[in-house]
Each structure stands twice: as structure tokens, then as C-alpha cells.
């Protein structure tokens, strides 16, 4: 990057499973840099590990301010409906506390056999297929949608429709503000309808637990509950699909590491930590607005400035990780921040780890000879949205 140029997001990504080279360039030469967004606005991007953690835990960087009606539409959908990523302080604490009542250790324990059954069914479908096949279509997408269906207590078809709206809304650089607004309106309407049904007829699912707890405690308004559930839907559908697919691509590209998991399932839990560090579901996240003048890494940010962090970049910082661009399923220590950091860290990290560990353990034991059916270098990126950095398809094969 020259001293006068401003990179435009989304950045080019020659290798779909790898972060954009632009992130490395910024991290090394301009760790707090201006970038141009699809909306045409300019925002700051923070890319180094310590600086990213600092921003994520600094109250002067406000999610709520980013969603205020007076703020420019740096990312249009942020202002369309409140969520956990657009509130701060006591309101955010109350929302997380309510969500934690649903995502408690007991719930995760009850979900473990459910997750195992979903994984087993998907792998049964894979075994019944004739290779080569698209792993994402047969395994990743069904698992992601069925996991969310169980959390919400709805049919997988409903989740598929929700996911379509999320995917379109996140593609602001491709479809324009008007379509983004329409998609978010449809998404909010669907979530509100589901919430009302759960209040009328609660079930044994996360959404019913949250809805009933909020009715008893009067912690949040219906609009705030909807916003919280939107966060769950956004992060809980597309992200697992991308992490499963990208993670498997990395394992099969480094076939010796896949074989380590085949030989010793006890290594899978640590491998999951490397998979989420190495295979991000996003390149930038956590839009915030600076509420007072602040200096980050020697760069002055004035009050009112929009700022993003890149956890993806932070997790490739050589000051934090030895050989950060090497994929190592036995990396130790591995103090990544793939699930975020500070007050807005992912509240479902324990549940996500359980799901990923269950999946990769089962996969490596049932398909020990799984391999890529086309060169790793030929993988194609799926879309150019703000959220997912997934692969279009992942063709795999195995001896029959």
C-alpha cells in the first residue's frame, strides 16, 4: 500500500481459505489504516493482535454509537435492527446474561447427543454418495442448518430461508442498500414470528428458554430480544458451514495432519483451536464508533470515527504466534481470539467447540482416507460479502 492509497474492502483473496494478503501488508506496515467500505465511506481498520484486543475491550469504541440513527451508514444493515453487536453497557450485559441462561453447561450437555446424531446422519449421506462429491453441499450445509434448527426449535427449511436472507444482506457490496434493507426486513419479520410462536408454545430449545426467561424477568423489550436472536442467527448458520468446510480443506491440504487425527482422536480438541484460528469466517468485524479522541498504535482517531477490527489478521500476528501462517493441529500455546474478546466475545464459544470437536472426531474416524478431489489451488471463493469467507464448493473423494 502506498502512502496515498486507501484499500477498498472487500479485499482480494487469491486463496479462498487464506486471509487477504492486504491484511498482512497492513499489519506489517500500517496497523491502524483507513479503508474504503462498500458504502463509499472511510473507516479505520485495526489489524495487530494486541491492538485488536485493546479495541475490543475499550469502552471508548462503541457498538451502540455505530448503530445510532445519526451515524452515517458505514455498513447499512447495522442500523436496520439492533443486535448484540450494536449495543453496549447494561443493555448488552442484560442481553448476554439472558442468552447465557440458554447456553449453560447443562444445555450443552443435553445437546451433545443431538449434535452427534446430526453429524452421524450427514456422514451417512456422505457414505451413501458416489465420490467425488461436494462436501459442503452434502455435509457442511445440512449440519449447519440442522444445528440452528435445533437451537431455535424450527424446521431446517425455515433455517434455510433465514440463511438466504442473512447471506444476501451481508453481500452489501453486490446487491445494494435497497435490497439489503428488504432482506433485513424479511429476516426481522421471520424472527419476530418465530419468537411469538415460542412464547405461545414453548419447546425444549434455546429460543424457548430465552423467550420464557425474558417474560418472567422482563429484562429486555421484544425488539431487543429479536436483536439478540438475530445475532444468534447471523453467527450460527453461515459461520459453522464456513468453518467446517474451510477447516476440512486445510486438513486435507495438509494430509499428514489429517492423518494425525485419524490415528489419535484425542488430538481433535486441540486441532479445533487451530482450525478456528487459521480458518476465519470473517475478515473484518465489530464495527464501532470512537466516542472520544484516542490513540492506537501511534495513530490518532478522533471522536466519531468508525473503526473495525480484524480478528483474522490478529490471529496471524507473528508477535503472538510462532510461524502464524503455518497450519499446525498441535500448536501449543494457541491463545487465539477467534471467538472474539472482551464484552462482545462470542457467548456460544463452548457450544461451538463441542460441535466442531464432535464433527471432526466423527469425520476422521469414519473417513480415514478422505482426500481432495481437485487441487487445493483450484478452490473458489463463495461471494464477496462482509461476513462469510467460505468456499464455493469442496470436492472430496475416498476409496470405495
Swiss-Prot record:
What Gene Ontology molecular-function terms does this entry list?
heme binding; iron ion binding; monooxygenase activity; oxidoreductase activity, acting on paired donors, with incorporation or reduction of molecular oxygen
Pfam families under this entry?
Answer: p450
Membrane-crossing residue ranges in chain numbering: 225-245, 294-314
Keyword terms: Cell membrane, Heme, Iron, Membrane, Metal-binding, Monooxygenase, Oxidoreductase, Transmembrane, Transmembrane helix
> What are the required cofactors?
heme
Q: Name one GO cellular component term.
A: plasma membrane
What are the EC numbers?
A: 1.14.-.-
Instruction: State the InterPro entries in the record.
Output: Cyt_P450, Cyt_P450_B, Cyt_P450_CS, Cyt_P450_sf
Q: How does it sit in the membrane?
A: Multi-pass membrane protein
**Which top EC class is given?**
oxidoreductase
| Main location group | membrane
Concerning Gene3D superfamilies, the annotation shows: Cytochrome P450
Residues annotated to bind heme: 346
Q: Where in the cell is it found?
A: Cell membrane
Highest taxon above the source species: Bacteria
Query: PANTHER family this protein is in?
Result: CYTOCHROME P450 BJ-1, P450, PUTATIVE (EUROFUNG)-RELATED
The record's family statement is:
Belongs to the cytochrome P450 family.
What is the protein's given name? Answer: Putative cytochrome P450 141
Organism encoding this protein:
Mycobacterium tuberculosis (strain CDC 1551 / Oshkosh)
Amino acid at each position: 500500500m502506498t502512502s496515498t492509497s486507501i484499500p477498498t474492502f472487500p479485499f482480494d483473496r487469491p486463496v479462498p481459505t487464506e486471509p487477504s494478503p492486504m491484511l498482512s501488508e497492513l499489519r506489517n506496515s500500517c496497523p491502524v489504516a483507513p479503508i474504503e467500505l462498500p458504502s463509499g465511506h472511510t473507516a479505520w481498520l485495526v489489524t495487530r493482535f494486541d491492538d485488536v484486543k485493546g479495541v475490543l475491550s475499550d469502552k471508548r469504541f462503541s457498538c451502540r454509537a455505530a448503530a445510532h440513527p445519526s451515524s452515517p451508514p458505514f455498513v447499512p444493515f447495522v442500523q436496520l435492527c439492533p443486535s448484540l453487536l450494536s449495543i453496549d453497557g447494561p443493555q448488552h450485559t442484560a442481553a448476554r446474561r439472558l442468552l447465557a441462561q440458554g447456553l449453560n453447561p447443562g444445555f450443552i450437555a443435553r445437546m451433545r447427543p443431538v449434535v452427534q446424531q446430526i453429524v452421524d446422519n450427514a456422514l451417512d449421506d456422505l457414505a451413501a454418495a458416489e465420490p467425488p462429491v461436494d462436501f459442503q453441499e452434502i455435509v457442511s450445509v445440512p449440519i449447519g442448518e440442522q444445528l440452528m434448527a435445533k437451537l431455535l426449535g424450527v424446521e431446517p427449511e425455515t433455517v434455510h430461508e433465514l440463511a438466504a436472507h442473512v447471506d444476501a444482506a451481508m453481500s452489501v457490496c453486490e446487491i445494494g442498500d435497497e435490497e439489503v434493507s428488504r432482506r433485513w426486513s424479511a429476516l426481522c419479520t421471520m424472527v419476530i414470528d418465530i419468537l411469538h410462536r415460542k412464547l405461545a408454545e414453548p419447546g425444549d430449545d434455546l429460543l424457548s428458554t430465552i423467550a420464557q426467561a425474558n417474560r418472567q424477568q422482563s429484562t429486555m423489550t421484544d425488539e431487543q430480544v429479536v436483536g439478540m436472536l438475530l445475532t444468534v442467527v447471523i453467527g450460527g448458520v453461515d459461520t459453522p458451514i464456513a468453518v467446517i468446510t474451510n477447516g476440512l480443506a486445510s486438513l486435507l491440504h495438509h494430509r499428514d495432519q489429517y492423518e494425525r487425527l485419524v490415528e489419535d482422536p484425542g488430538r481433535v480438541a486441540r486441532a479445533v483451536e487451530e482450525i478456528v484460528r487459521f480458518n476465519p469466517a470473517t475478515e473484518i468485524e465489530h464495527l464501532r464508533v470512537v466516542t472520544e479522541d484516542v490513540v492506537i498504535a501511534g495513530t490518532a482517531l478522533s471522536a466519531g470515527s468508525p473503526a473495525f477490527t480484524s480478528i483474522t489478521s490478529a490471529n496471524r500476528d507473528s508477535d503472538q504466534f510462532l510461524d502464524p501462517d503455518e497450519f499446525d493441529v498441535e500448536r501449543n500455546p494457541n491463545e487465539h481470539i477467534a471467538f472474539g474478546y472482551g464484552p462482545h466475545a462470542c457467548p456460544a464459544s463452548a457450544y461451538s467447540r463441542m460441535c466442531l470437536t464432535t464433527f471432526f472426531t466423527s469425520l476422521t474416524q469414519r473417513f480415514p482416507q478422505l482426500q481432495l478431489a481437485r487441487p487445493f489451488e483450484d478452490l473458489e471463493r463463495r461471494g464477496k460479502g462482509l461476513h462469510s469467507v467460505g468456499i464455493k464448493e469442496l470436492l472430496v473423494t475416498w476409496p470405495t
